[in-house]
Swiss-Prot record:
Enzyme class: transferase
Binding site for S-adenosyl-L-methionine: G61, W63, D81, D97, D122
Task of the protein: Specifically methylates the uridine in position 2552 of 23S rRNA at the 2'-O position of the ribose in the fully assembled 50S ribosomal subunit.
Major location (coarse): cytoplasm
Species, as recorded: Nitrosococcus oceani (strain ATCC 19707 / BCRC 17464 / JCM 30415 / NCIMB 11848 / C-107)
EC number: 2.1.1.166
UniProt gene name: rlmE
Keyword Ribonucleoprotein in annotation: no
Location of the protein in the cell: Cytoplasm
Signal peptide boundaries: none
An example molecular function term from Gene Ontology annotations: rRNA (uridine-2'-O-)-methyltransferase activity
Protein name per UniProt: Ribosomal RNA large subunit methyltransferase E
Reactions catalysed, as given in the entry: uridine(2552) in 23S rRNA + S-adenosyl-L-methionine = 2'-O-methyluridine(2552) in 23S rRNA + S-adenosyl-L-homocysteine + H(+)
Keyword Cytoplasm found: yes
Amino acid sequence: MAKRKSHSARWLREHFRDSYVIQAKAQGYRSRAVFKLQEIDTRERLLGPGRVVIDLGAAPGGWSQWAAERVGERGRVIAMDILPMLSCPGVQFIQGDFREDNVLAELQNTLAGCVVDLVMSDMAPNMSGMAAVDQPRAIYLGELALAFAQESLGPEGSFLLKTFQGEGFDALYEVIRQDFSRVRIHKPPASRGRSREVYIVARRSRKDNGGG
């Protein structure tokens, strides 16, 4: 218990001294995670005017903020989370578990037939500090996000997933490679150095293009 308290205290000290945290507050963003998305988007050009985006595990909304800025008035950003989220300009929010039928029905009504260009997931489990517990949970969330993306994306859609290196990562990565034509792994500078988190970018789903 003392070790966990010490770890939490260290994390808090680092968090409030973090230059990305300071920048996020100064620029009006809700979390430092926005800079990870910015860095990936700069390289991959996932977001652009008129695109339709679904943001899984969106709260507190940093990714949704950036996405709304990038897609503009002609685009759409639909944020989903089991947690509440404050309203955000240019973002439609659905609170609930995206596996549940009523939530999926609300999503379909919100999309109103629009083709989804990007599904992005910044979901992570509540960390216990025990890798044997946290890693399987993280991989499971990644599998859920992938299944959602496979069902939701348009024929040339893209998928952005935060996950963690460790047991189960290679298997998840291989499944993603089988379903998308181009897959890359990113470790953006805004990720903390000792963190095992990485971001998988998968593009051009083969689902509706005759691929396997």
